[in-house]
A protein has these predicted regions:
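Charge-rich, low-complexity N-terminal segments
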Residues: 1-52
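Charged, low-complexity interaction tracts
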Residues: 42-163
């Protein structure tokens, strides 16, 4: 009994996926800006490509981004108060200028509390910019990826020889 192992190089696919990943990051950033999700710019500035890797017979494209991206994407259900320090930082960065009510102007800490209370009571609406970016980029890049796979397979199949 003899075993034949076929190995395939996917250089065209690697290039196509790199283009896909860079297009995704650019599109995601522009959608966040479009939807006014740039308070401090921390989320947008945190988005970086970690590249394409092959792990356990799968191709994985990885990006790095601020951990709170999921609240921007999926929103937040009503219930608990968000972390007060995060809301206070957001109030300071945005900047939100409190309006006086009955002649009393709230401090930034009081304003952060009021915002936190509203989030706890009503939640935060989902933004869906991540999902929208994936859909847009896939529709633009799908043909490129399919062509890259075809080119890679054609070139590899033509060099396979059994002796």
């Amino acid at each position: 009994m003899e075993t034949i192992t076929l190995s395939f190089g996917f250089s065209n696919l690697q290039k196509a996926l790199d283009i896909f990943l860079n297009d995704f990051i650019s599109t995601y950033k522009s959608l966040l800006i479009r939807d006014n999700k740039k308070a401090s710019g921390n989320l947008i500035n945190s988005i970086k490509s970690l590249g394409i890797v092959y792990i356990n017979n799968k191709i994985q494209a990885s990006i790095e981004l601020a951990s709170y991206w999921k609240y921007v994407e999926y929103g937040r259900k009503p219930g608990k108060f968000p972390p007060p320090d995060k809301i206070l930082n957001w109030v300071n960065v945005k900047p939100i200028i409190p309006r006086p009510l009955n002649g009393i102007k709230p401090t930034t800490k009081q304003l952060a509390f009021l915002i936190s209370r509203k989030i706890a009571r009503d939640g935060i609406k989902a933004g869906n910019q991540f999902s929208e970016a994936l859909d847009l980029v896939w529709s633009r890049q799908k043909d490129n990826i399919e062509n890259a796979v075809s080119l890679d397979l054609e070139s590899e199949i033509s060099v396979i020889k059994i002796k």
